[in-house]
């Protein structure tokens, strides 16, 4: 570990609905079954990766798992668990591993793309499994950051990005550029054929590139999910 490097964690989750009949996608109705992260620096260099499958949900909540948005990937998960690419373990042990990485690399900031969703679903899962004995997944000391929020500030208004979205019809109903991780990565990488995998660690690998691109703009950004009081 290099004390001159400011290490950050980029994290992503995949979820299944608690109540499949509930309309809309809201963090309070989601359980985390896949959690992956990478320890990175602002230049996108990767120092450690983790890829976990939450056994408490993946094994014990089969009805919910059968309603997961990417349930067709379940056989892939089993193959990767057997090969050792993913670790099947309890949610408590996933959190323990995160705390270990935070301590080892002296991490003070954790990022996700649309962190509001990941933050909410991790807390929902934590509260469900501990019967609200423990209510928050991330330590209180961690600064919670959002690359979607950053992208709105330093990418969305770039003429090059606006033109890119217009040319490829990546626009919202209001005619503004969309800022999904998949579209942003297509813009950054120049790979129009890229399709997001929608598994935890794989998505982290594109989200850390979004983080890198935002930092490369050398502009003042409000990175934190929630504004300070």
What are these regions (language model features)?
Residues 2-125:
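Conserved non-catalytic scaffold segment of RNase H-like nuclease domains
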Residues 13-16, 147, 207:
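Ser/Thr-centric signal marking residues that sit
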Residues 52-55, 137-155:
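A short, structured active-site edge motif that brings together acidic residues
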Residues 80-87, 132-138, 191-196:
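Short, polar/flexible loop-turn hinges at active-site or ligand-entry regions and domain interfaces
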Residues 116-145:
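Substrate-recognition/cap helix-loop segment adjacent to the acidic, metal-dependent catalytic center
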Residues 145-172:
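Short alpha-helix plus adjacent loop in nuclease-associated cores
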Residues 109-116, 120-121, 164-229:
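Acidic, Mg2+-coordinating catalytic module of metal-dependent nucleases/exonucleases
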Residues 125-132, 153, 157, 187-188, ...:
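Active-site catalytic microenvironments for nucleophilic, acid-base chemistry
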């Amino acid at each position: 570990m290099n004390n001159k490097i400011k290490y950050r964690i980029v994290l992503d989750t995949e979820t299944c609905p608690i109540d499949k009949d509930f309309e809309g996608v809201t963090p309070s109705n989601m359980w985390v079954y896949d959690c992956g992260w990478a320890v990175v620096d602002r230049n996108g260099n990767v120092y450690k990766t983790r890829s976990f499958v939450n056994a408490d949900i993946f094994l014990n909540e089969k009805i919910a798992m059968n309603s997961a948005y990417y349930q067709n990937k379940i056989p892939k998960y089993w193959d990767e668990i057997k090969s050792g690419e993913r670790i099947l373990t309890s949610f408590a042990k996933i959190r323990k591993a995160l705390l270990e990485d935070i301590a080892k690399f002296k991490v003070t900031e954790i990022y996700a793309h649309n962190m509001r969703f990941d933050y909410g679903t991790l807390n929902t899962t934590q509260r469900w499994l501990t019967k609200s004995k423990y209510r928050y997944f991330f330590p209180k000391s961690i600064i919670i950051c959002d690359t979607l929020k950053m992208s709105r500030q330093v990418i969305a208004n770039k003429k090059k990005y606006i033109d890119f979205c217009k040319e490829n019809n990546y626009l919202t109903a209001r005619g503004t550029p969309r800022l999904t991780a998949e579209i942003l990565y297509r813009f950054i990488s120049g790979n129009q054929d890229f399709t997001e995998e929608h598994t935890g660690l794989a998505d982290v690998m594109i989200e850390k590139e979004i983080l890198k691109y935002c930092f490369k703009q050398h502009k003042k950004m409000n990175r934190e999910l929630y504004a300070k009081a």
